[in-house]
Design a protein with these regions (language model features):
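Active-site helix of classical SDR
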Residues: 100, 136-139
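Canonical Rossmann dinucleotide-binding motif of NAD(H)/NADP(H)-dependent dehydrogenases/reductases
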Residues: 1-17
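Substrate-binding pocket helix/loop in short-chain dehydrogenase/reductase
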Residues: 76-77, 81-86
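Residue(s) in the substrate-gating loop at a strand-loop-helix junction
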Residues: 120
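The beta1-alpha1 cofactor-binding region of Rossmann-like NAD(H)/NADP(H)-dependent oxidoreductases
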Residues: 40-50, 82
Length: 216
């Protein structure tokens, strides 16, 4: 979604500031017209601040911020691991918090701006094995609504975008708890994984619909 959004906005003559945890990931974007790539790790306050300072130096104004970074973790609560829980919270929720917090002063001084947080239908409905992913997306929903009330006097709008399984590599990259040897758990893991992959494969037209909606 992030790459498709960057390309769509750039094609519509926006200056796109594309941030990523490794610039190697953005090699195919670096020579595209209107796209400017910056190193930024959403889990690192220092990295966010460094990127922000460079971006503000390079551009006079910033009109919109899209928080898109996200990872998945499909696990039973009993089998969950602290490191994986920490990772999904740091990326999916605290990443949104930290990046938003960094750029709010820029928008406030400009007296305009828009913060768009990519959430998910998972922020509204729940599925088994999604205890941690759904929790982070629901946190983004609540955080965004509260922040919107705080920033309205500064002409800064905040919204979330909730969509289902887009045809990206997200599902393939989801971290899953290992086979447990518990028949009920293993059967449910297979069932949920199969359903999500099938839904993802069907939604081939969802990504362009999302990018078009963001631009509007």
């Amino acid at each position: 979604i992030g790459k498709a959004t960057a390309l769509h906005f750039a094609a519509n003559h926006w200056n796109v500031i594309a941030t990523m945890i490794s610039l190697d990931e953005g090699k195919d974007l670096q020579n595209k017209p209107n796209i400017h790539c910056y190193l930024l790790d959403v889990t690192s306050t220092e990295s966010i601040q460094t990127a922000k300072e460079k971006i503000v130096q390079d551009f006079k104004t910033i009109d919109a911020l899209i928080n898109n970074a996200g990872i998945g973790y499909r696990s039973f609560v009993e089998l969950s691991e602290d490191t994986n829980i920490k990772s999904i919270v740091e990326v999916n929720w605290l990443g949104v918090v930290k990046v938003s917090r960094a750029f709010i002063p820029v928008f406030r001084m400009q007296n305009h701006g828009q913060i768009i947080n990519i959430s998910s239908i998972a922020g509204l409905v729940n599925l088994p094995l999604g205890s941690f992913y759904h929790s982070t997306k629901q946190a983004v929903e609540s955080f965004s609504e509260c922040m919107a009330y705080e920033l309205i006097d500064f002409n800064i709008s905040v919204c979330t975008v909730q969509f289902g399984n887009a045809a990206t590599n997200f599902q393939s990259n989801v971290t899953k708890s290992p086979t447990s040897g518990i028949a009920s758990y293993d059967a449910l893991m297979k069932k949920v994984t199969d359903i999500l992959h099938k839904k993802t494969a069907k939604n081939t037209d969802l990504t362009p619909k999302i990018t078009q909606k963001l631009l509007s």
